[in-house]
Swiss-Prot record:
<comment type="subunit">
    <text>Homodimer and heterodimer with ETR2.</text>
</comment>
<feature type="binding site">
    <location>
        <position position="381"/>
    </location>
    <ligand>
        <name>NADP(+)</name>
    </ligand>
</feature>
<dbReference type="InterPro" id="IPR011032">
    <property type="entry name" value="GroES-like_sf"/>
</dbReference>
<keyword id="KW-0560">Oxidoreductase</keyword>
<feature type="binding site">
    <location>
        <begin position="199"/>
        <end position="202"/>
    </location>
    <ligand>
        <name>NADP(+)</name>
    </ligand>
</feature>
<keyword id="KW-0444">Lipid biosynthesis</keyword>
<comment type="function">
    <text>Catalyzes the NADPH-dependent reduction of trans-2-enoyl thioesters in mitochondrial fatty acid synthesis (fatty acid synthesis type II). Fatty acid chain elongation in mitochondria uses acyl carrier protein (ACP) as an acyl group carrier, but the enzyme accepts both ACP and CoA thioesters as substrates in vitro. Required for respiration and the maintenance of the mitochondrial compartment.</text>
</comment>
<keyword id="KW-0809">Transit peptide</keyword>
<feature type="active site" description="Proton donor">
    <location>
        <position position="79"/>
    </location>
</feature>
<keyword id="KW-0275">Fatty acid biosynthesis</keyword>
<keyword id="KW-0496">Mitochondrion</keyword>
<dbReference type="Pfam" id="PF08240">
    <property type="entry name" value="ADH_N"/>
</dbReference>
<dbReference type="GO" id="GO:0005739">
    <property type="term" value="C:mitochondrion"/>
</dbReference>
<keyword id="KW-0276">Fatty acid metabolism</keyword>
<dbReference type="GO" id="GO:0006631">
    <property type="term" value="P:fatty acid metabolic process"/>
</dbReference>
<feature type="binding site">
    <location>
        <position position="172"/>
    </location>
    <ligand>
        <name>NADP(+)</name>
    </ligand>
</feature>
<dbReference type="InterPro" id="IPR051034">
    <property type="entry name" value="Mito_Enoyl-ACP_Reductase"/>
</dbReference>
Length: 386
């Protein structure tokens, strides 16, 4: 369990030998008890002393932080990884900060900090950071540096990161990339992966990354009135083939998929499951011998059910994938993966999943903006910007 960043709670005005100086007044969204976000969140003001930084300390201001399903689950108390509660924000009762993903700008560094400087963009280096806030105080190793747009331009890159790309870089793109590269060796130009949830954020990243790595892919999506339009958009992103859930579950359609795979001279080696239920059974059946299915979500709330014959006669393997667990003790892997995603963004080769952005301008309590984000999350990913 990671502890939250330190907070410097002191009077707003401090007397020095010859003058008064002001403090940074910050705000954070907290909760003292688990429950529904609409019931338990509140905004807490706290102060950061920017004139008395320890040598390794860094002050950052928030540029943007999204509302993720895992954030909601943490507040509800049903997520395995939870932030520690603390009185460091100035609360009477111990309280936990909300949010795991976010993009920050460095505004001041301590005397021993050489890896960061004012103006740098950073993201948290570990989970349970507490990103639903206006500012944070931490040590330099609490952050991973990303290139800001000016730095990308100075390095000759055609594109700089957007706030949305930076604020949402550490979960969905990394999940897609690591599932495709960390477990199974897919032969470029030949081998296939199949995924359900093809229109989800991770699904779209997987289609794009698969194309960039020259992997063939099949994306499974639900039937819908504008099916042809959605299929065309997913193929434009990078999906080799797109099928419906009915086709995924149809034994009659199976030979068509086998023919696709046969024509490439490869095998279907990997399945990515975020749905469960019949959908997961269907994509598991498409794999060749020794195939692996990674489950990283369960949107249908139905159990993953695999026929016994797949285990016995095809040596099928089913495993879970949790990007938090994989990366929590492996900063090097996280950094190298981030660098690849950043390079694709800078080169214009990867399109980010768009968010619905809401600007925090101080006219509404901060926690209410995130409560609105939770309530509206079914309409798309919500991003609070500053």
């Amino acid at each position: 369990m990671y502890s939250v960043l330190k907070q410097s709670i002191r009077p707003r005005l401090l007397a020095t030998h010859n003058q008064f100086r002001t403090m940074i007044t910050a705000q954070a969204v907290l909760y003292t008890q688990h429950g529904e976000p609409k019931d338990v969140l509140f905004t807490q003001s706290f102060e950061i002393d920017d004139d008395n930084l320890a040598p390794n300390e860094v002050i950052v201001k928030t540029l943007g932080s999204p509302v993720n399903p895992s954030d909601i689950n943490q507040i509800q108390g049903v997520y395995p990884s939870k932030p520690a509660k603390t009185t460091g924000f100035g609360t009477t009762e111990p309280a936990a900060p909300c949010g795991n993903e976010g993009l920050f700008e460095v505004i001041k560094v301590g005397s021993n900090v050489s890896s960061l400087e004012a103006g740098d963009w950073v993201i948290p280096s570990h989970v349970n950071f507490g990103t639903w806030r206006t500012h944070a105080l931490g040590n330099d190793d609490d952050f991973i540096k990303l290139p800001n747009p000016a730095q990308s331009k100075a390095n000759g890159k055609p594109n700089g990161l957007t706030i949305n790309q930076g604020a949402t870089i550490s979960v969905n793109p990394l999940t897609a990339y690591l599932m495709l590269t960390h477990y199974v060796k897919l032969t470029p130009g030949k081998d296939w992966f199949i995924q359900n949830g093809g229109t989800s954020a991770v699904g779209k990243y997987a289609s794009q990354i698969g194309k960039l790595l020259n992997f063939n892919s099949i994306s499974v999506i639900r039937d819908r009135p504008n099916l042809d339009e959605v299929v065309a958009s997913l193929k434009e992103l990078g999906a080799t083939q797109v099928i419906t859930e009915d086709q995924n579950n149809s034994r009659e359609f199976g030979p068509t998929i086998k023919e696709w795979i046969k024509q490439s001279g490869g095998e279907a080696k990997l399945a990515l499951n975020c749905v469960g239920g019949k959908s997961s059974t269907g994509i598991a059946r498409k794999l060749n011998n020794n195939g692996l299915m990674l489950t990283y979500g369960g949107m249908s709330f139905q159990p993953v059910t695999i026929p016994t014959s797949l285990y016995i006669f095809k040596n099928f393997t089913s495993a879970g994938f949790w990007v938090t667990e994989l990366l929590k003790n492996n900063k090097e892997l996280k950094t190298s993966t981030l660098n690849q995603i950043i390079a694709w963004y800078e080169e214009g080769k990867l399109t980010d999943a768009k968010s619905i952005e809401t600007l925090y301008d101080g006219t509404k309590p901060l926690h209410e903006l995130y409560q609105d984000g939770v309530a509206n999350s079914k309409d798309g990913k919500q991003l609070i910007t500053y």
